Amino acid sequence: MNAPHPDEALLRRFEPVLRLTKGDRFFPMDVEPYVRACSLWVQRPGEEPVRVVPGGKLTLETLPQQPLDGSGAVHFLRFTDPQNQPDGESRGVGALRERAVRGLRETREVFKAGRGRLARVGYVSRFVDALYSITLLARGRVPGEAAGSAAITYQGLMEEREGYSYHGRVARQEGWTVLQYWLFYPFNDWRSGFFGANDHEADWEKVHVYLAQAPDGELRPEWVAYASHNYFGDNLRRRWDDPEVEKVGEHPVVYVAAGSHASYYAPGEYLTELDLPLPRRLARIFRGMRGFWRETLGQYVGGDARDAAPFHIPFVDYARGDGLVIGEGGDRAWDPPKVISEPAPEWVSGYRGLWGLYARDPFEGEDAPAGPMYNRDKTVARAWYDPTGWAGLDKVPTPAEAAAAALERRRDLETRREELRSEIGEKAARLRKLGAEAAAVRGRSHLDARGRETRRRVADLSAELGRLRARLAADDAVAGSLSEYAGRLEAGELDPARSHISRAHRPASATELRFSRVAEAWAAVSVSLMLVIFVAIAIFEQEHLISMLVVSIAFFAFAEAGFRGRLANLVGSANIGLAAVASLVLLYEFFWQLVVAAVLVVSLYVLWDNVRELRR
C-alpha cells in the first residue's frame, strides 16, 4: 500500500464543498478514466484531423508522447467520438442525436431557466446576441449530439466506479502556501443545456486557498479565490473572514454554475456579459463620448461606470446551489485527492494539447481547454507558475510580514528623502545663482541673447525644483501613513475585508429578476421587430424616411424604458439631448445675431462694473 503524499492531509483539511445546480449532469472526476475513454487526434495546418490513438488505448503514461507533432500542430482528445461508444450502443449519428435530445429533455424537466435574460440588457446587447447566435452556424462548434453522447459515456464510467475527485497541488510562493484544487469536468454543456455561451468537451476549473504561517508556526487560511470564466486579479479574491465566504468548518463553500462550472461565493443567477472589443480608434471615441455624457453632463451617475466595451453578449450563470453537494456534510464525499507533486507528472507537464474536441472556433469558446499547466496556445498558464499573481495576491504580504514590509518601505522612503533634500539644496543654490545672473544682465543690450537663455534656464530649473519639492512633500506624507499603518498592524487591526474589490460579481437581486411576462416577450421580439420595421420604412416610406426612422426609434426607446422601469431617466436624458440640439440649431441659424448680442451684453457688463467701481 502506497504511503499518503505529505501534502494530502493539508489538501483534505481545506478541500472545498461544491454546491451544484439541479439539472447539471457532469461532476468533478479523476482524469484517468476520462483519458482511457478518449481517442487522441492531431490537427495539422491545412490538413484534416487524424486520429492517432483510438479510444480505449490511451493512458496517462502514453498521453504526453504527442505523435505526429510539428509546427502548428494541435493535439486534442475526443470524448464524444462515435467510435468510442460502449458496446451495445448504436453508433449512428441519428441515434446519438435522439439520445442527446432525450437527455436534454430530461435536463430541462429538472432545470427551469430564470426569467429575463434579454430583458436585463439593452437593444445593442440583444442585437449582438442575435449575431453571435447566427455565427454558430458558420464557425466551428461542438456537434449538437455531443452533450448527449458525453452524458452516456460519463454515466458508463460512473457505473463502473462512482467517484468524485479533484487534483490537488500545493505551491509555495513568497511566504504563501497555495492549495490548488483542480476540478475536472468531462463536459461543459452551458449552451445546449442552460442557454449559455458555449459547449465544449472537458472543463478544468480551480479553487485556491491561500495559507500563511501564524506566529505559533501553524498554517492558517487567509484568502480564497474561485475561478470564474476568464476573470483574474483582486476581484476574484476574498479574505477568509469575509462574510461572503461561506464555510463548513474549515471547508469553503463553492456555488457551481450549471453547465459552465464557473465558481461563485453566493447562490443566485449571475449576468455574465462577454465583451466584444472595438478597434482602438473607435474605442477611444467611445470612451470620450461616454466620459462627456457621464462626467460632464452627469448622466447615469451611480450606475455601472466600469471601463467596458460598448457591445456585450448577455448570458446567465445559474449557480443556485440546489443540486448535488460534494464534500464535507454533503450528498457525496470526495475521493482521496489526486496529488500533483513537484516536479509535475508527465501527463501534466508533457501534454500541451487540448483535453477535448478542437472545434476550430475563432472565438475559442467551443474549443476544449488545455490542462492545468497550460493555456490553449501551449504557453504556461499564470495560475500555474504565479498562483499569487493570478489572484492579485503578489502585492500583499503575509500577515506576519505586513508590518515589517510597511516599516521597510518607510526606511526606503527615508533614504530617498535624504537624497531628495540633498538634490533640492544643490539645485536651489544653482537657481539662486542663475537668478542673480538674470538680474545682472537685465537691461544690457549687448547681453540680450544671454539674458533670454538665462531666463529660460531659470524657468526650467524652477519648475524642476517645484516637482522635486512636491515629491518630497508627498514622500513625507506617505512615510507618516506607513508608520501609522504599521502601528495598526502590530496592534492586530486589519484592513476592511473587501477594500481590495473594485467590482464584485453579485447575483441578480429580486428586483432585477422581477420582469413581467410582457417585458420578457418584448425583449425576445424587440430586435426582430425593429429590423422588420426599419426594412418596411426603407421600402414603403422613402419620401418620409428620416421622420419615420426618428418616430420608430423614439417608440422603441420609450417602450424599452417603460418595460425596464427607466422612463423618468429617459425623459430627463431626452430633455437634455433636445436642449443641446435646439441650442445647436439656434446657433447655426442666428450665428451673427448671437455674436452681436453677446458682444453687447459683455460690453454693457464691463461698463456697469467700471461705473460701479468709480462710485465707490
Which residues make up each language-model segment?
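Conserved hydrophobic/aromatic beta-strand scaffold that supports enzyme active sites
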Residues: 206-208
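A domain-level signal for the mature, folded cores of soluble proteins
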Residues: 1-203, 215-514, 521-528
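Alpha-helical transmembrane segments of integral membrane proteins
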Residues: 496, 503-616
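Short beta-strand micro-motifs enriched in acidic
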Residues: 210-214
